[in-house]
Amino acid sequence: MTTDAPQKAVVLFSGGLDSTTCLAVARRDGFLPCALSFEYGQRHKVELEAARRVAKAMAVTTHLILPLPLGSIGGSALTADIDVPKDRDIGEMEADIPVTYVPARNTIFLSMALGWAEVLGASDIYIGVNALDYSGYPDCRPEFIAAFEAMANLAVKEAVEGRLAIRIHTPLLHLSKAGIVELGTSLGVDYGLTHSCYDPAPDGLACGRCDSCLLRRKGFEEAGVADPTRYRPSL
């Protein structure tokens, strides 16, 4: 007796807490995850090492890392010589669009994922956007995701011809960071392999002070789960 092979799904995958949880959710949902990462000129390039570690630990058989020179465009603290904000409270984080916003990044990432999905014959794309903890980012909003999905179904040959419908999955969209940690923990995610810091030390240790580090620490604390992150010794 033979069984049908699981359907493929493209998972946008940075090696961070959110995208790793998203990868675990895609697998839980019965898909064969095809992980897609980008080397886009980010100052925290160490996240790609985390992505490789996680992919290996989770036995991901297809992991593509694409070069994408967004550093040539700049305009973000993650891709240009702009200071990463530190020691901000939640109110400050949510007050406006932060300088860590990378212009059109999720639009570009999702477009690349869409192209790869078309080649793979996949109709499902997972992205770990979160509208609660990153309310300042325009490309993490439900309206953006809905608009991109509508566009995708007008852009892909087989969707236009009626043979498939592109679905953008956002399982973390309305979860708090604590809720994400709880979900991933229930799915067996090893968060010690992941990386979230925007401004890591040369040896990869997290700064513990950027928005991403602070939200990550807050998530573990509120979830009552031990934080496995390795922070700089001064913290």
From Swiss-Prot:
Keywords annotated in UniProt: ATP-binding, Ligase, Metal-binding, Nucleotide-binding, Queuosine biosynthesis, Zinc
Record-listed E.C. numbers: 6.3.4.20
Catalytic class of the enzyme: ligase
Keyword Transcription regulation: no
GO biological process: queuosine biosynthetic process
UniProt remark on cofactor binding: Binds 1 zinc ion per subunit.
Record protein name field: 7-cyano-7-deazaguanine synthase
Name of the encoding gene: queC
